[in-house]
């Protein structure tokens, strides 16, 4: 067994005669592209034959937050959680958070029948009472991935960089237990399809119970890449949501669906990001709206019946790379819940629209240390047209127990 720090990888590669170079390359080629995911592991444990390598890494991150002229009732900046009028007189708030600090283990192996395979587990301290919470636990081989991971109905590489852990409202982000298959069918063209564990968040109603689900969620996508860190992607998801009509003692189902277009492109020192999502009954997948429990909602004046509402989310962002160590970005996003069958009439104080504006700058002080500063502004509008706003300043310091990816542009998966 050999233990290697990342600084010695190149020396190790030069002396390699047992296929270990290929394993090290797999670590970097399969690096997760989301801004908040940890980078390549700093330490490796390898076996004598060079068939297996275990990477250990993570980061410690501390954030200071100050809200002014309106607050958000959470450590993440979620416009849906801007307090309702009259619920609080507090207009300023100071918070600190270290719960997004992350630890991961990544095993890479080579076998005769499975080829290169990956076992990845990661977690942070976002559990109840800041306890450890699993974020990823999956096995990948031959294009298949099984386990718990971020969902397939999202585009990690097209997400803009933020200190705020949630990210823009209207962006698709969720995690699910799943089985998926992804393949490169030709140069630049990649496809994926999966089945995911369903989870339905609905508004409580008399004579209705949301319980066991009978069908998996089915996401799929097609992605075309024309250069490093440049791609467009079109995806969709189909879901069946079961609820119990206790008036007629009958199980009923509603169909939810969503479509999405996303992408990112590198133009000189600039990086562009964007996403647009529209659908029905897809609330749990969209930032901001996912806090409202509106996958399915009661149908007005009809006891025991539910309905699905239309909704959308989108964002557009721009990043400029001043150098390999310094970059800045700005993103605007919006999410919207639409009404049908008098839903707004009976829920006037319900969220109708959220907006999110963020601007930030990051400095990679060294391979291990990154600091950042960020301004956020959020708006919440209800169906009765009442508006509330909030502002936040974030400051962060992140020390990486892994190799910091100093190139500030995303990596395509």
Cite the ranges covered by each PLM segment.
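Transmembrane beta-barrel architecture of outer membranes
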Residues: 134-136, 176-178, 215-221, 231, ...
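Conserved small/polar residues in nucleotide/adenosyl-binding loops
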Residues: 405-412
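Sequence/structural signature of outer-membrane beta-barrel proteins
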Residues: 67, 110, 124-128, 153-155, ...
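Detector for outer-membrane/organellar transmembrane beta-barrel domains
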Residues: 227-351
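Outer membrane beta-barrel
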Residues: 45-76, 86-200, 214, 219, ...
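Repeated loop/turn-to-beta-strand initiation elements of outer-membrane beta-barrel proteins
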Residues: 112-114, 143-146, 187-191, 229-232, ...
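N-terminal periplasmic/intermembrane-space "pro-region" immediately following the signal or transit peptide
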Residues: 1-68, 407
